[in-house]
């Protein structure tokens, strides 16, 4: 029987950079995490993972089996560079091909959830056409994911198109597909003018995972825990009382820090203390 403890994971970019997943998962285990979320961002180096050989994919599966630390989710932010809403047909086609490869990769290595970035476009000007193309691209993507039995989950973003659970639910209702769900970031959700607790309650039944980070209005990255506006204890209480039992992922970008492991351990202790106050975990 699976343990009733809260699954707590760490973002790949919080840990030292490199391509050795056995080392990364061993470190995550030492730090007390249950899982690591993989990043496939817009850089060529991380995009290249989608073209890994069979042997490279098997090495990841083997590392998971050896350490017991899972890689159940992928943060797919590559669509900043190749957006599904692009008015350039070649760029949009590339975005759909990245989606196809990501779904195939997930199927091969056991990733269950691909977190999507809710940008119709990122470096270009958005308009009605980019949003229409984005919707159509999502529909095509969810069709692919359905066939592969891989869940696509929309992140709540640092971008007005997808800055609330209510807006993301609109896409969930439009797509009406069990393989499309929500992956809120309580930091991003709190940085906008949202009723955060009401939004979290509205998403219950569609939330498959939760990103945990601190933010300030207009500042969505690298805000030290406790220095931003997120009311972590209330968010954790709301999710617990609403019946959410899924994973939480600490999102950090400390891979280039002098001592990433120390930064992560400090953040882990801070977050777990707030979880304990919310009655989610036992106090240390």
UniProtKB/Swiss-Prot annotation:
Pathway(s) served: Cofactor degradation; L-ascorbate degradation; D-xylulose 5-phosphate from L-ascorbate: step 3/4
Disulfide bonds: none
Cross-referenced SUPFAM superfamilies: Xylose isomerase-like
HAMAP family attached to this UniProt entry: UlaE
Reaction(s) catalysed by this chain's protein: L-ribulose 5-phosphate = L-xylulose 5-phosphate
Name of the protein: L-ribulose-5-phosphate 3-epimerase UlaE
InterPro entries, per database record: L-Ru-5P_3-Epase, L-Ru-5P_3-Epase_Enterobacteria, Sugar_Epim/Isomerase, Xyl_isomerase-like_sf, Xyl_isomerase-like_TIM-brl
Family: Belongs to the L-ribulose-5-phosphate 3-epimerase family.
GO terms for MF: intramolecular oxidoreductase activity, interconverting aldoses and ketoses; L-ribulose-5-phosphate 3-epimerase activity
Induction: Induced by L-ascorbate. Repressed by UlaR.
Pfam families for this protein: AP_endonuc_2 (PF01261)
Keyword annotations of the record: Isomerase
Lineage, uppermost ranks: Bacteria, Pseudomonadati, Pseudomonadota, Gammaproteobacteria, Enterobacterales
Leading EC class: isomerase
Gene transcribed to yield this protein: ulaE
Species whose genome carries this gene: Salmonella paratyphi A (strain ATCC 9150 / SARB42)
Enzyme Commission numbers on file: 5.1.3.22
